[in-house]
Regions:
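Gly/serine-rich nucleotide phosphate-binding loop at the start of the catalytic core
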Residues: 1-50
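Electropositive, glycine- and tryptophan-enriched low-complexity nucleic-acid-binding patches
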Residues: 37-43, 95-151
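Active-site-proximal, Lys/Arg-enriched surface segment
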Residues: 47-115, 125
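Short, surface-exposed basic-aromatic patches at helix termini and helix-loop junctions that form
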Residues: 61, 146, 166-173
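A structural signal for short, well-ordered beta-strand segments and their strand-loop junctions
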Residues: 69-72, 118-120, 153-155
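A short acidic (Asp/Glu
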Residues: 81-83, 162-168
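Acidic, metal-coordinating catalytic cores used for nucleic-acid/nucleotide bond scission
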Residues: 155-162
Length: 173
């Protein structure tokens, strides 16, 4: 059996370093690994099962939980050309100003203003877990404070400014 060219360390470093384009094609283009192609990345991802805890274990040494800011926002990974993808569904995209087939990620990042490090995430699939994006935000914030985070500020998009979210932020201030 051929050794996998992609690895968790390579993929995590790619996600941290690349602030704009998160695709297997982009990783294969910028990778220091010789002959890493989009198909290799796709095979590796499909054979792997990662959790938010795996992400945290990879990045916690890069984060100073006593400083910086926590930033929460969601992003839609456009999958308009994907025929079969159980995570993708029609969702509103602010970038496209309309419905797009895609995967919605709710992300929690730590930033020191100079760098942005993802520390937690949730895949938004209300039909699978009956959770809203606000529920995911609250779960991630509670987990972050449980990990010892004490940010200067928690920065959120106005979509996350519900009374219950703001009370939770204030509770940890």
């Amino acid at each position: 059996m051929q050794k996998q060219k992609c690895s968790l360390k390579l993929y995590t470093n790619f996600l941290i370093a690349n602030q704009n384009r998160y695709s297997g094609l982009e990783l294969s283009r910028v990778s220091p690994v010789e002959d890493l192609c989009h198909d290799s990345v796709s095979r590796w991802l499909s054979s792997s099962n990662f959790t938010p805890s795996d992400l945290w274990n990879q990045v916690k040494s890069l984060v100073d939980v006593k400083t910086g800011y926590l930033l929460c926002d969601d992003t839609l990974l456009n999958k308009q050309y994907s025929r079969v993808n159980e995570l993708a569904k029609k969702q509103y995209s602010g970038n496209e100003h309309g419905l797009v087939n895609g995967i919605c990620l709710v992300n929690l990042l730590w930033t020191s203003e100079d760098e942005f490090i993802p520390v937690d995430y949730r895949i938004y699939r209300k039909e699978a877990d009956d959770k809203t994006k606000n529920d995911h935000f609250q779960d991630m914030l509670i987990r972050a404070f449980g990990r010892g985070f004490s940010p200067l500020y928690v920065l959120i998009d106005s979509w996350y400014s519900s009374i219950s979210n703001l009370k939770l932020v204030r509770k940890f201030s």
